[in-house]
A protein has these predicted regions:
Chain B
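Short, surface-exposed ligand-recognition loops at beta-strand->loop->(often short) alpha-helix junctions
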Residues: 1-2
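Short, non-transmembrane amphipathic alpha-helical segments
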Residues: 7, 11, 50-59
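Short secondary-structure junctions
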Residues: 11-20, 61-65
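Short edge beta-strands and adjacent turn/loop segments
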Residues: 17-34
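Solvent-exposed beta-strand sheet faces enriched in polar/charged residues
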Residues: 23, 36-38, 71-73
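Histidine-centered active-site/metal-ligand motif
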Residues: 32, 51, 66
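A short interface-forming secondary-structure element
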Residues: 34-48
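C-terminal structural segments of small proteins and small subunits
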Residues: 55-87
Length: 158, 87
């Protein structure tokens, strides 16, 4: 049964010249595209749930490949997000991810930040939340960073 | 290539606009844009909702861009923003 299904989709893909345009949205091909997206979807879902802070970016934190991605990494660094609570994904290394993350988040650009599995936003949003103090609140409330210690005097104690 | 005029037309067709700035941040290449929109349509929407809303209005155009950034304010927030700048 499986082999027949495989042969059918191969046939549909193998002879595009003889296949009229309408067949390009044939059920088999449409199913194939949806299937790939579902698998990619599950992978992303798992990734955003596995670590508290997940950033989809261009490049890596040590070598960002885009000004917006660099800014996002810097902002998270300013808030002292610990390494073990954060994971980044380089969409330039994975073209399927680069496309699928945009569909998954329904967001057209990179970088994209997730905190505790929830989409927070891109660089603009991150920067404005940083300036307003909202980002600090979010990271504290999500248990990513400890709440700020109340100001102590600098007297030394024995 | 997307022109600033395209973006402006799309935004104005979708929502009432108090103030609008569109900047081509790709040095005239029409590939990267930053928009600043002030509209009462943003009342009651948090930042993410506003950005998703604009993303939807400019969906086709953004898909063709290399980069896009936006700043969205309500009329009241814009007044406060101007006051702070004047100070």
């Amino acid at each position: 049964m499986f082999r027949t299904a495989l042969r059918t989709s191969f046939t549909a893909l193998r002879a595009p010249a003889r296949v009229p345009a309408t067949a390009l949205v044939s059920p088999q091909l449409a199913f194939t595209r949806r299937y790939i997206t579902q698998e990619a979807r599950a992978k992303i879902q798992q990734a955003v749930e596995s670590t508290p802070v997940v950033l989809f970016m261009k490049g890596t934190p040590d070598a960002p490949q885009c000004g917006f991605s660099r800014a996002a990494v810097q902002v998270l660094g300013i808030h002292g997000v610990p390494e073990e609570k954060m994971k980044t994904f380089d969409v330039l290394e994975d073209s399927e991810l680069r496309q699928s993350i945009k569909e998954f988040s329904d967001w057209p650009t990179i970088p994209q930040l997730y905190v505790n599995g929830e989409f927070v936003g891109g660089c603009d949003i991150l920067l404005s939340m940083h300036q307003s103090g909202e980002l600090d609140d979010l990271l504290v409330k999500s248990g990513v960073i400890p709440p700020e210690e109340p100001e102590t005097t600098t007297q030394t104690q024995n | 290539m997307i022109s600033a005029a395209d973006l402006e037309a799309a935004i104005r067709a979708a929502i009432p606009v108090i103030h609008l700035e569109i900047e081509d941040t790709s040095n005239g290449c029409g590939e990267n844009y930053a928009v600043f929109v002030v509209s009462e349509a943003f009342e009651g929407k948090n930042t993410l909702a506003r950005h998703r809303f604009i993303n939807e209005v400019l969906k086709g155009q953004i898909a063709q861009m290399h980069a896009f950034s936006q700043k969205t304010l309500t009329p009241a927030q814009y007044q406060a923003h101007l006051a702070k700048q004047a100070a």
